[in-house]
């Protein structure tokens, strides 16, 4: 089974934006390379972290940024309320700017703190468990230099700690921070991108005061703060565009603990809860248009592929089809749970947690 099949209708088409034909397209496909005569905007790379358990991963993440063909102006590691870790990073990473999270606990506050400490015209967000290829910034900056483009994201490939389970459906790879089946296979204007490897213009980010600090990832709780940011910027920046590039310039680690059916279910429940919260904040139509398309087109196609695989002798196809049905059902339950409990809740911080 291939995990990279695309929809007949791209997410950009569904959003009413379509595929952009711009001067950066040859950069996005690797056609032009990195020219010395290209005046790239300055970019600050912001990496949030919170635990010493990710120390080796952080080293590899920082090294991948230092190896970029287009150098970053600065690399800022933001430590989320862990003074000992901040001190150690400051000592062990002499070429990195280490700063504390001066906002609310969690990755949204950490990213906002990183932006406040940065100087670049563009801010790039990278997770501490991700590894960028050397052309990551070159490819994405090619898009963000295009008039009207406020931000850009890219394909994130899975770096599995244990073998990928045969039952795991590619349509739900987003639950583990990896790009999922059905995404556009050409540079496309989309509703939102993801913060595991996002570039955004500082001016646009500051226009909406950054991420909501009571809505995002805190420990094992994970809400769609990246989608919320993209929607809020699009609402205030007239004719602004978010770009998606399918170039595989990012790898995201998938710990063995996330390669389980239990994690998939808990993550989907929380995502449904978060989408309901976001619909309340940003409007139902804007917040759920792509999700409704995903549920109506991408998931049924995935179930069909799994059944077809099983008919050809790949019994694991039944597992993938069953997992799609179960995961979608749990996400719907999470959405419904938010609606039931919302009269008694004051803020998103009361969200349930996903299992690690």
Where are these regions (language model features)?
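Short aromatic/hydrophobic "clamp" motif used to bind/position activated sugar donors
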Residues: 123
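A short, conserved alpha-helix in the catalytic core of glycosyltransferases
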Residues: 198-200, 204-208, 215-248
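N-proximal low-complexity "stem/linker" segments adjacent to membrane-targeting elements
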Residues: 2-64
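Conserved donor NDP-sugar-binding/catalytic core segment of glycosyltransferases
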Residues: 135-167
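Short, flexible, basic/aromatic active-site loop/helix in glycosyltransferases
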Residues: 154, 171-190
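Glycine-rich, basic loop-to-helix element that forms the pyrophosphate-binding segment
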Residues: 101-118
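Short, acidic, metal-binding catalytic loop of nucleotide-sugar glycosyltransferases
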Residues: 63-72
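Non-catalytic, C-terminal membrane-associated alpha-helical segments of glycosyltransferases
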Residues: 267-270, 284-356
